[in-house]
Amino acid sequence: TFTEQKNTYPLSADGSKYVVNGFIPFSPMIDESIYANALLWTIKNVCSAQRDGITEVSIPAKSFSCNLVLTSQADAKQKNTYYCTAQFQVKDGKLVYYLSNIQIESSVVIMKKVTPMEKLQPEKKPSHQETMDDFVQIESQMLNKLFDFVSTNQLSPITHWNEINIGKPVKGMTEDECL
């Protein structure tokens, strides 16, 4: 599995911004199954309330965006909360991901301080490099869990894409379709 292999997805520069981007092929799965599994996992694991945090869903484009909130692990040296925008799109048997607008919330004495990832200077300050490494570890764990779910979850057939697109449950939908 992706989780067992501990795959990591590093930060890279996109212009002046730090992002995490790439794609994972899921052949021989069909695009609709990849998309449905990715969206279902995100709804169940990322959103605190039903679809809360998902900012855009386009079934025709097989894409969705959400606001991610990731927290340093309990045993980590860092004690940060990370906020970012995640965009996913399925195309030609691949799940494309793009994490951007990465913000770090750290505790400074009794206050919380929010800093854009771009403000960090890892070449000058080792603590900044540790923060970046912490973020990569956490987002990589999240992506690995998502990719494992996409590759292993057996979906019941999804036949109500139009209703899902407008968020309207109808009689005959499966539980997964209603999410």
Task: Please give the residue ranges for each predicted region.
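Residues within mature, well-folded domains
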Residues: P157-L179
